[in-house]
A protein has these predicted regions:
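Non-catalytic substrate-recognition and accessory regions of acyl/acetyltransferase enzymes
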Residues: 1-140
């Protein structure tokens, strides 16, 4: 995908990435982490994303930075997912917004860039208690 992204740094384990959002509210450290999970004999990675909270050394996935760089942040996360899958090509990644509004934002971003994404990744959504191949005309 040919979108404007932030430079990011990979942590040693390749399971963590960091970059900085820059805008009217300053420079804010963002973290993307892939955490291995196991369910019903399947291993997958949960994608966690948010602002780094220096006070408690945790990712805050409900923070609102308002740096007017949402699309650049989402493109950076997409680039990180592609980087991660280049190291683990057959991996399953689970991602869900921390709020319904964020989940919807991610769905819209997938739909807008669907032509390119569909060539690179298999994307599924969970709807009506089943997994379905993502289709840009449906909400999940």
């Amino acid at each position: 995908m040919n979108l404007d992204t932030y430079n990011y740094k990979t942590h040693e384990s390749i399971l963590g990435f960091e970059f900085y959002s820059e805008g009217p509210n300053g420079r804010v450290k963002k973290i993307v982490r892939f955490s291995p999970q196991h369910s019903n004999g399947i291993t997958y990675f949960n994608l966690t994303f948010g602002d780094w909270n220096e006070n408690n050394n945790q990712i805050d996935d409900r923070a609102i930075t308002n740096n007017q760089d949402r699309n650049k942040i989402l493109a950076t996360i997409a680039s990180i997912v592609l980087d991660f899958t280049s190291h683990f090509p057959d991996v399953i990644i689970y991602a869900k917004g921390s709020t319904p509004a964020r989940t919807r934002l991610y769905q819209i971003s997938l739909a807008v860039n669907w032509q390119e994404i569909d060539r690179m990744l298999f994307v599924y959504g969970f709807r009506d208690w089943n997994w379905h191949h993502f289709q840009k005309k449906h909400t999940i």
